[in-house]
A protein has these predicted regions:
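Conserved mixed alpha/beta catalytic, RNA-binding, or beta-rich assembly cores of soluble enzyme
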Residues: 1-329
Length: 329
C-alpha cells in the first residue's frame, strides 16, 4: 500500500479501502440485501442468507469492475458520460438540471480530486454515475489534470472533501444557481449551506445522498435543510422524512423531495416539466414503475405519477442482518 494514495468509500454497509488501483481492505458488512446492488452486479445474486464472505467477495468484485472498466482511483479514470445509468440517480438529475438551466453549476465529489465545481453536464455524470459514498481521498494527478482540462475547478490540490468550501468558491466564481451533493454523515453542513444561500442571495439545491447508517440527529438535520434526500438503506430516514415529503421517487430505495425548490429541480429531469411544476405542494405524490396514474419520462425511463400518502414501501427493500442499521456506522 502507498500511504500517499489511499481512498476510503462506503459500499453495501462496508468501508472499502483502495490504494494504487487495488482493493486492500473491506470491513465486515451488516447489510445483507440491496435491490440496486443486485440489479447492477451479478455477484450479489449469489448471496444466500448472511454469508459475509460471499458478500465481501461481491463488494470487492463490484469495486474492481469500476477500476477495470472506468479507471476509478487511477490516472485512467473516465470522466465524461451522458448515459442515464439508473432512473433516480443524483448525478443523472444534476446532469439534466445543468442541460436545462435549472442550475448553472454543480458541486460534487470525485475520487483523486475531492470537492470539484463544474458546469459541464457530462462531467457530473462521468464522475457520479458509478460513484459510491466517498469518505476520504488523496490526490491523483491524472484525474486532477483531466478535470481542469474539462474546465472544472478543483477546490483543493490535496483532494479535500469540503462541500461548503466548494459552494463558497462557486458563488465567488459568479454562479447563482448551484446544486450540491452532501453525504449523510456530513449533514451538519446543510444548515451552513442555507446560511450561505441567504447571505449571498443565491439558490442552492441541496441533495442529501449516501444516508445508510446515519444517526437520528443527522436525519433531523436533513429533514430541516435538504431539498432532496436519497434514503439508501435507512429505514429510520424513511419513517422520519417520508411522511413530510411532497414526492417519493421509487418504492424500493426511495428518493424524497421535500421542498418547492426540490420539485422545480426534479421538473428539469422530466420531459413533462410543466406537469411536475403544476402539482399541488400540499399533497403527496409517488413516482413508480407500476402502471398507475399518469405516465412521465425521467431521463430514459418511464414512470407513473399518482397521489399517495407517503412513504410507500417496496416489496424488496434493503435489509440488515440484525435489523440494526446503525451497526454499519
Amino acid at each position: 500500500m502507498d500511504t500517499r494514495d489511499i481512498h476510503v468509500l462506503k459500499y453495501f454497509s462496508s468501508f472499502v479501502s483502495v490504494s494504487c488501483g487495488q482493493v486492500i481492505n473491506i470491513t465486515e458488512p451488516t447489510l445483507r440485501f440491496c435491490p440496486l446492488a443486485k440489479h447492477l452486479y451479478k455477484d450479489f445474486s449469489n448471496i444466500r442468507g448472511n454469508d459475509k464472505e460471499t458478500i465481501k467477495s461481491a463488494i470487492k468484485s463490484a469495486i474492481e469492475s469500476k477500476i477495470k472498466d472506468y479507471g476509478f482511483f487511477t490516472d485512467s479514470r473516465k470522466l465524461s458520460c451522458s448515459d442515464v445509468s439508473i432512473p433516480y440517480g443524483a448525478s443523472e438529475m444534476l446532469m439534466s438540471a445543468l442541460k436545462k438551466g435549472a442550475i448553472d453549476a454543480a458541486v460534487v465529489v470525485c475520487e483523486g480530486a475531492g470537492t470539484i465545481i463544474t458546469d459541464v453536464p457530462e462531467v457530473v455524470q462521468g464522475i457520479g454515475a458509478r460513484m459510491n459514498s466517498l469518505l476520504l481521498t488523496s490526490p491523483i494527478k491524472g484525474i486532477i489534470k483531466k478535470l481542469k482540462t474539462a474546465g472544472c475547478r478543483v477546490v483543493s490540490e490535496n483532494a479535500l472533501i469540503d462541500q461548503l468550501r466548494g459552494v463558497k468558491e462557486a458563488i465567488e466564481a459568479g454562479y447563482k444557481k448551484i446544486g450540491v451533493t452532501v453525504c449523510g454523515h456530513s449533514a451538519e453542513s446543510l444548515k451552513m449551506l442555507r446560511s450561505l444561500e441567504k447571505e449571498y442571495g443565491v439558490s442552492i439545491v441541496c441533495l442529501a445522498i449516501c444516508t445508510t447508517g446515519i444517526t437520528k440527529d443527522k436525519i433531523n438535520m436533513i429533514r430541516d435543510c435538504a431539498d432532496l434526500v436519497w434514503s439508501c438503506a435507512s429505514s429510520d430516514l424513511r419513517r422520519t422524512i417520508g411522511p413530510l415529503a411532497i414526492l417519493q421517487l421509487s418504492r424500493q430505495i426511495p428518493v424524497f423531495v421535500l421542498t418547492k425548490k426540490g420539485m422545480d429541480f426534479i421538473s428539469a429531469y422530466a420531459d413533462e416539466s410543466e406537469l411536475i411544476k403544476s402539482l399541488d405542494m400540499k399533497k403527496q405524490y409517488l413516482f413508480s414503475n407500476e402502471p398507475s396514474g399518469q405516465c412521465v419520462h425521467l431521463g430514459s425511463f418511464e414512470a407513473f405519477i399518482s397521489e399517495s400518502k407517503l412513504p410507500v414501501n417496496g416489496r424488496k427493500e434493503p435489509s440488515f442482518e440484525d435489523k440494526n442499521e446503525y451497526a454499519s456506522v
